[in-house]
Amino acid sequence: MSRAPKLTLNLQFPAARSWPEHKALLPRATVAGWIKAALFADGELTVRFVDADEGRTLNRTYRGKDYSTNVLTFAYAESEDDPVTGDLILCCPVVEKEAAEQGKPLIAHYAHLLVHGTLHAQGYDHEVEEEAEEMEAIETEILAKLGFPDPYQ
């Protein structure tokens, strides 16, 4: 029987002053549970919840895109044998806006984006159709096990 992956989690919430209701939805144990559900190997991750300015700056600096995005993943493992290491950056106002536009609970959207970002940290991508289909199927399966509906419906 295989053991569940171990997670070392650094949770940062500099946006808490502006988005206290988001921080209240995201206690450490909840965030860790969602990430562990998406980890296939031991991991060391930092999750940082930011405002629009920091999100835009990071997206512009590292992706060349001058706007805030919902989640950025910075993966640092150099080989498949290394533990999963990375930073997940979630932009609170973008996540809130998307959840409202999509008619889904904020907590469900955060769960989806944390699972999505964790998969990116493990090398999954969605730049081509086949990869996108595989990644979406994995996300949907993980979220169902966590009690959330299919985020793509």
UniProtKB/Swiss-Prot annotation:
Cofactor annotation: Zn(2+)
Keyword Cell division: no
Residues reported to bind Zn(2+): 116, 120, 126
Disulfide bond entries: none
Main location: cytoplasm
Cofactor comment: Binds 1 zinc ion.
Location in or out of the cell: Cytoplasm
One Gene Ontology molecular-function label: metalloendopeptidase activity
UniProt keyword list: Cytoplasm, Endonuclease, Hydrolase, Metal-binding, Nuclease, Ribosome biogenesis, rRNA processing, Zinc
Example of a GO cellular component annotation carried by this entry: cytoplasm
One biological process term in Gene Ontology: rRNA processing
SUPFAM superfamilies: Metalloproteases ('zincins'), catalytic domain
InterPro entries: MetalPrtase_cat_dom_sf_prd, YbeY, YbeY_CS
Chain's role: Single strand-specific metallo-endoribonuclease involved in late-stage 70S ribosome quality control and in maturation of the 3' terminus of the 16S rRNA.
Family: Belongs to the endoribonuclease YbeY family.
NCBIfam families: rRNA maturation RNase YbeY (TIGR00043)
Protein name: Endoribonuclease YbeY
Provenance organism: Paraburkholderia phytofirmans (strain DSM 17436 / LMG 22146 / PsJN)
Origin organism lineage: Bacteria, Pseudomonadati, Pseudomonadota, Betaproteobacteria, Burkholderiales
